[in-house]
Amino acid sequence: RSVSRGLGDVYKRQIKGNVEKGDNGLLAVPSRVSEARDALQQAFEYAKVIKSKNIHAMAGVTDLSTKSLVTFIDNLKFAKELVKDSNIGLVIEPLNLNDNPGYFLTRVEQAKEICELVGSDSIKIMFDFYHVQINQGNVINRFEDNLPYIGHVQIASVKGRCEPDRGELDFSYIIPEIYKLGYKGMVGAEYKPRTTTDEGIAWMDNFK
């Protein structure tokens, strides 16, 4: 009932930059503001076409300087104005450093502070239990503490980022719990199938 199968809830591919050259987002990279804003505008147009509710505004690989932080905030403020007359929002996602070395945004609390500094209900956190467990742990308490700022949830197994039916996190407990806490959005599953997609999708039977 609550696990998303569709593409409409989050659209997130158009702000990664040039993946072949090592990009993993652009919005916090001071030298690429123009490119980041062009990508935001393109993502916004695509999101309107596919009726997406959210755009994933990826920070990118950069240092933790004040300049990078200001760049990220300024680009998000630009994005805030871009979407203000639409039903489309933006999500920022803390990623784990094991899989994403050098990524700017790595902690849920850091993401919350950025949301506060941007000052818009259209900017929310994408809370990916896989990344949060690896980087920080204490996932349920951390989710509850930041719930007003969470706009989307993703799940996958820890470790391996495979189907969310085994590993360190028990999603048969976690998913009902986040709704008890007051979360009202969708839960997306972003993972690498252990075998094939068709064989792996059986895990969803436990979440109907």
PLM regions and their residue ranges:
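Short glycine-rich loop/turn motifs that provide flexible caps or phosphate-binding loops at active sites
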Residues: 7, 16, 59, 166, ...
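Active-site-proximal loop/turn and secondary-structure-junction residues that shape catalytic pockets
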Residues: 16-17, 59-63, 94-98, 129-131, ...
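Short secondary-structure transition/capping segments
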Residues: 4-5, 22-26, 67-69, 103-105, ...
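Short, small-residue-biased leader/transition segments that mark boundaries at the very start
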Residues: 1-11
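Histidine-acidic metal/acid-base catalytic patches
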Residues: 51, 89, 105-127, 131-208
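Active-site acidic/histidine proton-transfer and metal-coordination neighborhood
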Residues: 23-124, 134
